[in-house]
C-alpha cells in the first residue's frame, strides 16, 4: 500500500500496528495477572488479620499463612443495622457493596464523622478461635479519612466486646514520619488492654496529646500529626458507634457468640 517505507503514511502505519500490538500484550497481561493479584490481595488480608490477632511470628512464611488462617479464623458476616450475624454471601466485597445503593447506606453529614460518605449494610468480622474451637478474639475492619488519605485498619477485640487486643493499619497515605506513624508497632503497642466504651456506653477510646494518662481509654497522639489523630478518633467514633459495629459489640457483650 505504501511503497515508500519512509513516507508519512508508512510511518503512521507502523506506529498504529505497534500501538495495537502493545495494547493486545498489555490487555492480555492484565487478564493473565488478575488471578495472581486477587490471590495476593487475599493473602495480604489474611496476613494482617493474623498479625493483629497475634498469630504471626517473625519467622512465619507466606506459604504458611493460608494454613494458619484456615485453622484459626472464621469469617462471619454481620448486619450492621441490627448487629446480628447474617447468612454468608460468597464473594462478599465491602468495597464493591458501597458502590451499590441496594447494598449500602448513604450517611448524613451528622452521621458521617469518619468521612466515608457511604457504608455497606454488611461487614465481615473474623472470629479467632483456639484449638478447642472457643472464640478468643474478634477482628473488626475499620477505615476513615485522615489528613491526606483513607486509612484502613483492623482492630482485635476480646469476647467481652469492650477490651482491645490490638490494632493495625495496613493501607494509608499519611505523611511519612508524622501521621504515617500510625503503622509504627511502637505506637500500636499502646492499644492492648484499652477499653472501647465508658461506663455509660459512650465510645471512650481516643487518641490525644498526653491521653495515655487516661489508663482506660487514652492513646498518646503522634507528635505533629493532629489532623491524622483527629481522623483516627473519628474512625473510632463511627465504627464503634451505632452506625458501625456498636450494635454488634453490644450483642457480643451479651454473649451472642455463645449462640451465633
Curated annotation (Swiss-Prot):
Identify the keywords attached in UniProt to this record, alphabetized.
Cell inner membrane, Cell membrane, Flavoprotein, FMN, Ion transport, Membrane, NAD, Phosphoprotein, Sodium, Sodium transport, Translocase, Transmembrane, Transmembrane helix, Transport, Ubiquinone
Indicate where this protein resides in the cell. Cell inner membrane
UniProt cross-references to InterPro entries, sorted A to Z: FMN-bd, NqrC
Any one Gene Ontology MF annotation carried by this entry is: FMN binding
The portions of this protein that span the membrane are: 12-32
Query: What are the annotated GO cellular component locations?
Result: plasma membrane
Cofactors named for this entry? FMN
Show the SMART domains listed in the entry: FMN_bind
- Main subcellular location of this protein, as a coarse class: membrane
What does the record give as the function of this protein? NQR complex catalyzes the reduction of ubiquinone-1 to ubiquinol by two successive reactions, coupled with the transport of Na(+) ions from the cytoplasm to the periplasm. NqrA to NqrE are probably involved in the second step, the conversion of ubisemiquinone to ubiquinol.
Regarding protein family, the annotation reads:
Belongs to the NqrC family.
How the protein assembles, per its UniProt entry?
Composed of six subunits; NqrA, NqrB, NqrC, NqrD, NqrE and NqrF.
Identification of the protein by name:
Na(+)-translocating NADH-quinone reductase subunit C
Q: What is the native source organism of this protein?
A: Pasteurella multocida (strain Pm70)
Upper lineage is: Bacteria, Pseudomonadati, Pseudomonadota, Gammaproteobacteria, Pasteurellales
Amino acid at each position: 500500500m505504501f511503497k515508500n517505507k519512509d513516507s508519512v503514511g508508512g510511518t503512521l502505519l507502523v506506529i498504529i500496528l505497534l500501538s495495537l500490538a502493545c495494547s493486545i500484550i498489555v490487555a492480555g497481561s492484565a487478564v493473565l495477572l488478575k488471578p495472581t493479584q486477587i490471590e495476593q490481595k487475599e493473602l495480604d488480608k489474611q496476613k494482617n488479620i493474623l498479625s493483629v490477632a497475634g498469630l504471626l511470628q517473625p519467622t512465619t512464611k507466606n506459604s504458611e499463612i493460608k494454613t494458619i488462617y484456615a485453622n484459626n479464623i472464621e469469617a462471619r458476616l454481620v448486619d450492621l443495622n441490627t448487629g446480628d450475624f447474617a447468612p454468608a454471601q460468597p464473594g462478599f466485597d465491602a468495597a464493591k457493596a458501597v458502590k451499590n445503593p441496594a447494598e449500602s447506606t448513604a450517611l448524613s453529614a451528622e452521621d458521617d464523622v469518619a468521612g466515608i460518605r457511604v457504608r455497606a449494610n454488611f461487614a465481615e468480622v473474623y472470629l479467632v478461635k483456639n484449638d478447642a474451637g472457643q472464640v478468643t478474639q474478634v477482628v473488626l475492619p475499620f477505615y476513615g479519612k485522615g489528613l491526606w488519605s483513607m486509612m484502613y485498619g483492623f482492630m482485635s477485640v476480646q469476647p467481652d466486646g469492650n477490651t482491645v487486643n490490638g490494632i493495625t493499619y495496613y493501607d494509608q497515605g499519611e505523611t511519612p514520619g508524622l501521621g504515617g506513624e500510625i503503622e509504627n508497632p511502637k505506637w500500636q503497642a499502646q492499644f492492648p488492654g484499652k477499653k472501647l466504651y465508658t461506663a455509660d456506653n459512650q465510645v471512650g477510646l481516643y487518641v490525644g496529646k498526653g491521653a495515655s494518662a487516661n489508663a482506660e481509654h487514652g492513646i498518646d497522639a503522634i507528635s505533629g500529626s493532629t489532623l491524622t489523630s483527629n481522623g483516627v478518633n473519628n474512625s473510632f467514633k463511627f465504627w464503634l458507634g451505632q452506625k458501625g459495629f456498636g450494635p454488634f459489640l453490644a450483642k457480643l457483650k451479651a454473649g451472642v457468640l455463645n449462640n451465633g
